[in-house]
Swiss-Prot record:
SUPFAM superfamilies linked to this entry: F-box domain
CDD domains referenced in this protein's UniProt entry, alphabetically: F-box_AtFBW1-like (cd22157)
Transmembrane segments: none
Name of the featured protein: Putative F-box protein At1g47790
Annotated F-box domain residues: 19-65
InterPro entries: F-box-assoc_dom_typ3, F-box-assoc_interact_dom, F-box-like_dom_sf, F-box_dom
Gene3D superfamilies in the record: 1.20.1280.50
Organism this protein belongs to: Arabidopsis thaliana
Amino acid sequence: MEQQEKKKRKVYRRRRLQSKPTSSFPLDLASEILLRLPVKSVVRFRCVSKLWSSIITDPYFIKTYETQSSTRQSLLFCFKQSDKLFVFSIPKHHYDSNSSSQAAIDRFQVKLPQEFSYPSPTESVHGLICFHVLATVIVWNPSMRQFLTLPKPRKSWKELTVFLGYDPIEGKHKVVCLPRNRTCDECQVLTLGSAQKSWRTVKTKHKHRSTNDTWGRCIKGVVYYIAYVYHTRVWCIMSFHVKSEKFDMIKLPLENIYRDVMINYEGRLACVDKLYTLNNDGIRLWILEDAEKHKWSSKQFLARYVHNDLRTNTISKLTGVTHAGEFVYISTQYLKSFVLFCDPKKNRFRKVEFNGIVDEEFRLSNGVGRGRIYALYNFPNHCESLMSL
């Protein structure tokens, strides 16, 4: 892997040296500056010259930018209104504080593809998000404001369960599709960015069915999701290795876990203990230590899975964890613009309010109305991507 990276860097540097600059501005310096800019500024610079465009669209530059972008993450929200998707991005440094605060946001709207009715999203994986509506899969790059509708994986599959994975070694995204509510021993896989946008059949020795409410989680090149295995008749975690396209089965630490939430806790997969949460005031996380040995460890926290604020009559649910280790709570009925962050070890909550998401001015100017917004999608730890769909 290290030799591959060195080779790519040499090719990238040779290409820049062979190019004839239109000014005396050093290209190495230009690249370093571009790598530090937000994606909307980088996209604008593609129009400066053919040379600058070739730098920005170079695969090695894109991968390097995405690697650096992973340290400049944001909290992304979006909701659908008519044929538009309203998008709100809150940079990490705006909410990365030890106290309650107010934060500014970056917002925009995009026109939706015709197939985009009432979609189910994946998590944000290395800058991309997948939506699926019945048997239609739509890939979205919020940074580039691009949508890509993929060909249907199978005519006989009327509804799908969709996962998005990323291979950090080769820098490739892959979409994984399974038939919804059907037991099978194969899936369809499509590699994004390849010349041929076609599906491949990948077999698995574990005949299984994914749950209706499962949310996949991609961690370090492996996609995890909850499934029911046919031959053992038990619920388990299925893992899909994005690079090798190999499936494995991981035993659950216990049956009573929340099937609609899996989180990335300190770079490892974690499940929430449902029984412990219902019987106690806190949260117990089961953290995957060794997938091959089916080994899990547990941690208890005072923070609750659902936070009920009686003063504001709002209920917020645990949706993820920031890279700083804070639990992220999002309101289930969005009327006011705020997010709760919790230090789980100290059980200390702080509220960050965001002006401009569903405030009066925004509602009036966009015809949203005064009611609660129920289908507000949120994506913690979203990073920017220059990948063109």
